[in-house]
């Protein structure tokens, strides 16, 4: 309630193992995923929780959840574990996303939280091992598995514009995924992939994506992203990395490496320049301005590092 200044423990959480992700489609209703294929649900904005789904025998974590509204959503996890609900979690049904025999971990799923257009509310995305990028147009009923040309793991992703997502991976790998029309000209130097729906309402519809690598100046893995109020994207990563990506105006990436070098797991914007960073150092406010001033000031005792690279 006070932009992260104070925190209180939830009154009731009937689960003692690791929780991995949270999705709150409305003010009071929230869902969280965790180990033992567990899904928790809150009716009061996170004050109290109940176990809504659990499969201890599966012995694998659910890693991410995205609720499109108070009724429909998907939860994804290790070994291609995929669940979907259409009734607010009263029941969760197994979902088929990828026929890869390797059963890649599905690390993160997200939607169009910015609402560029109404139909985008039905769109969903996911990323995982083997550089896989997944797209759905019907709230997770049917998915396209799209090859990106990257063989590492993507840990997170975010929709940054209509038809575009940033995919965040291992060792500082960031990929811009751009949707093209079937007859649109695509520069020959881009990695491209086409996939077609085999069932459902969109059966036979095909999508063409092109992928660009974006160098942000770090080899640390990137863990989470969110949009600032002015359209820039803030990224968090291991080793104290925080980056702000400006793809519209300055076309650059400013990266701060905090002096404690402790890893960041999540980021929440607080306007244009400030954001909350959560990770090994706890939860605290941070700003790129403060990092830059520490770096250039001769009197500063901070060991923060700051650098800037251009987006080609």
Residue locations for each model-derived region?
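Residue-level hotspots at or immediately adjacent to binding/recognition sites across diverse folds
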Residues: 1-312
């Amino acid at each position: 309630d006070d932009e992260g200044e104070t925190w209180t423990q939830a009154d009731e959480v009937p689960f003692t193992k690791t929780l991995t992700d949270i999705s709150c489609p409305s003010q009071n209703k929230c869902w969280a995923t965790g180990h033992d294929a567990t899904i928790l649900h809150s009716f009061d904005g996170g004050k109290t929780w109940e176990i809504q789904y659990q499969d201890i025998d599966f012995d694998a974590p659910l890693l991410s959840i995205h609720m499109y509204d108070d009724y429909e959503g998907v939860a994804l996890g290790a070994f291609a574990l995929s669940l979907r609900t259409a009734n607010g979690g009263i029941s969760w049904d197994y979902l088929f996303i990828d026929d890869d025999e390797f059963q890649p971990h599905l690390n993160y799923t997200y939607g169009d939280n910015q609402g560029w257009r109404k139909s985008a509310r039905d769109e969903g995305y996911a990323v995982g091992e083997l550089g896989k990028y997944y797209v759905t147009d019907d709230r997770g009923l049917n998915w396209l598995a799209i090859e990106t040309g990257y063989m590492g793991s993507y840990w997170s992703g975010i929709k940054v514009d209509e038809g575009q997502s940033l995919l965040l991976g291992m060792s500082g790998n960031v990929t811009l995924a751009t949707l093209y029309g079937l007859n649109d000209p695509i520069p020959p130097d881009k990695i491209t992939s086409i996939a077609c729906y085999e069932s459902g309402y969109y059966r036979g519809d095909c999508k063409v994506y092109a992928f660009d690598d974006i160098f942000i100046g770090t080899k640390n893995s990137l863990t989470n992203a969110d949009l600032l109020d002015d359209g820039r994207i803030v990224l968090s990563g291991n080793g104290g990395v925080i980056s702000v990506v400006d793809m519209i105006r300055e076309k650059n990436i400013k990266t701060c490496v905090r002096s404690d070098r402790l890893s960041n797991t999540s980021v929440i914007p607080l306007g244009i320049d400030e954001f909350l960073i959560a990770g090994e150092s706890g939860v605290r406010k941070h700003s790129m301005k403060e990092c830059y001033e520490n770096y250039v000031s001769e009197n500063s005792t901070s060991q923060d590092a700051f650098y800037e690279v251009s987006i080609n």
